[in-house]
Amino acid sequence: MEDVQGRADTRQIEINKVGIKDIRHPVRVRDRTGRDQHTVATFSMYVNLPQHFKGTHMSRFVSILEGHDREVTVESFHEMLAEMTDRLEAHSGHIEMAFPYFVNKQAPVTGVESLMDYEVTFIGEIHGGRHETWVRVAVPITTLCPCSKEIAERGAHNQRSLVVVTALMDGFVWLEELIDLVEREGSCELYGLLKRPDEKHVTERAYDNPKFVEDVVRDIAGRLNDDGRIAAYSVTSENYESIHNHSAFALIEQDKRGR
């Protein structure tokens, strides 16, 4: 049978990324306790397509996923990137692997345990044989408005905020380390389960530690700047304002490699 996508294309336009998007597959991720978490990730896999090819081989992307013992690990994620560009005869490739990641947390006063889930994404890129691996963590926190605290006679408005850190690694970093870093720079961190003494503690903790959205990203950026294992990063914070029908947002980007 004729391979239609293998035909020549006469438009002379290269495609930057072509492939499959949002395919789910089992993955295994080792956490800081040394245990493996079995979860399901959503993959997006792309390669470049030279101008003289009509189409790419879409089935090969799925075949690469299926070839990893039906369960992808962090180690095989890096192998997949090289395999993908090799099998599809491309000089650049891009893989994203997004999955829920769970951390067991203790409430601050009673010590009651519960799970917190975080959205994690591994982003791998290869271009001309050069690899880069980025890790993205989305961490919810509580923020309390310094202005509201200053002007109000009783209380202050607070809200849940979402911080997203995307970091280029130049050394090994546990996911929990990035999560801990973010949570320490909020007005207060979140928990899956709180008893009344815990709720009192987190309410007072947030009140004693007010932060604007600008404070959050600057404090996190300062911590990332001090970590030699992180070569570049972006950090965003979105505050889901409790007294407005809009969000507050801030972004800092930094390439510590001097580019």
Swiss-Prot record:
Statement: the UniProt record of this protein carries the keyword Cell membrane: no
Sites annotated May be catalytically important: 145
Source taxon at top rank: Bacteria
Pfam families referenced in this protein's UniProt entry, alphabetically: GCHY-1
Gene3D superfamilies per the UniProt record, alphabetical: Urate Oxidase (3.10.270.10)
Entry's Gene Ontology molecular function annotations: GTP cyclohydrolase I activity
Coiled-coil positions: none
Keywords: Hydrolase
NCBIfam families found in the cross-reference section: PRK13674.1-1
Protein name in the entry: GTP cyclohydrolase FolE2
Organism listed in the record: Halorhodospira halophila (strain DSM 244 / SL1)
